[in-house]
Amino acid sequence: MTIIDTRTPDAKRLIPGATGDWEIIIGLEVHAQVISEAKLFSGASTAFGAAPNANVSLVDAAMPGMLPVINEECVKQAIRTGLGLKAQINHKSVFDRKNYFYPDLPQGYQISQFKQPIVGEGTVIVSVGPDRQGEFEDIEVGIERLHLEQDAGKSMHDQHPTMSYVDLNRSGVALMEIVSKPDLRSGDEAKAYVTKLRTIMRYLGTCDGNMDEGSLRADVNVSVRRPGGEFGTRCEIKNMNSIRFIGQAIDYEARRQIAILEDGGKIDQETRLYDAVKGETRSMRSKEEAHDYRYFPDPDLLPLEFDQAYVDALAKELPELPDDKKARLITSLGLSTYDASILVSEKSVADYFEKVAAGRDGKLAANWVINDLLGQLNKVGKDIENAPVSPDQLGAIIDLIKDGTISGKIAKDLFEIVWSEGGDPRALVESRGMKQVTDTGAIEKAVDEVIAANPDKVEQARAKPTMAGWFVGQVMKATGGKANPQAVNDLVKAKLGIE
């Protein structure tokens, strides 16, 4: 296969070495577990967290005479994912046997797809950032292919002092292996790419992306070269199950390779693992080539064939994907690129926001969801599905601001009460006397008292009009934050004779 270099060197991405600049070349193989009640070739459950070897059929255990039967739902999920990646859907694909020995691979081979995968080339637009100015940079990452394959079981080395056990619950679970082109040039780009893939699949409902459960793993191929030069020898870092660790592993591995090359050495093509505790990669074994696996078509499975009508029917069912949703939020609600990017990054966040924003000021809703709700959730380590404040409650708080019942400051206090205690925001405002003061007579009295108590500040304010803000703050403090801020501001300026 000829690898085409589609990107020109970017000075921002280069790594300075002792003998000049270096460029990192990164390609990823992402293994995504298909959301399906049954495995790829058997009816065994795919439920996470079951007792060891509870979800194992005779097919999964490779008992003699047991034949695989394709799970059509897994095929549909692969096609949906391919469509979400704007990729070519191949109407004919073939399952192959990939031969290697692992104790947790009962068949002695893995059923995968080699020369004829179900999905061909596609593209993903990845937003890298934001930078210090809050700007994102969009890059296009090519998808080489997506193919279906079986997962292996799990070897357990911590259950007995002298023996290893094998759990076959994962054996035969359907995986989509999504292979990128070598279009990534930094750890940050790689992290953004995996994040985007996960977001797309969560929107599609084809993979839950729970890396802590092993539903999404990545093999990271890293090499370095002089800017614009020939591709270097790559090393593969296996089974990365954290987006943060992917970035750390790439940064370490690139510097390791640069140090070797600058000392006059050469890079060995090998498979490595990342030690998150030590923050370093280390060698596992020499890297296998395709011929080492002795691929051949699986004689127990016919080629997988379907027509364009089958693909079109699935395409009609696809939900709105993150890029389309982001464009719509920017166009229809006037959101900034930054705010829209944050809101569509997780489907659950986007769904929550759209419920809050329905029939309301989109920018105000975005501000509350991003800064107040997500900010508080991050502090306490909760996700939005478990938010103590529902979309209806947050929407009610926004309504109270817009109709002048409460000020922005009171709204912050009300949000904290709803977060901690629950309840209907409008009823809480009534029962706790939280309505803002709109009676101009009462506000004027408070303004007069503050001005009378601070004659020296009055003269300063007339010389320096920005001092009016100090008076506004004092009046708000005197009224317990209940005075209408705009009314206070107008009265202060009028009383001080400030334009």
Curated annotation (Swiss-Prot):
Keyword Ribosomal protein attributed: no
Q: Which Gene3D superfamilies match?
A: 1.10.10.410, GatB domain, N-terminal subdomain
The domain of life is Bacteria
Zinc-finger listed as a keyword: no
Top enzyme class: ligase
User: E.C. number, please?
Assistant: 6.3.5.-
Give any GO molecular function from the UniProt entry.
Answer: asparaginyl-tRNA synthase (glutamine-hydrolyzing) activity
Q: Which UniProt keywords apply?
A: ATP-binding, Ligase, Nucleotide-binding, Protein biosynthesis
Q: Which GO terms describe its biological process?
A: glutaminyl-tRNAGln biosynthesis via transamidation; translation
> What are the disulfide bonds?
none
PANTHER family referenced in this protein's UniProt entry, alphabetically: GLUTAMYL-TRNA GLN AMIDOTRANSFERASE SUBUNIT B MITOCHONDRIAL AND PROKARYOTIC PET112-RELATED (PTHR11659), GLUTAMYL-TRNA(GLN) AMIDOTRANSFERASE SUBUNIT B, MITOCHONDRIAL (PTHR11659:SF0)
**What family is it from?**
Belongs to the GatB/GatE family. GatB subfamily.
Can you say what this protein is called? Aspartyl/glutamyl-tRNA(Asn/Gln) amidotransferase subunit B
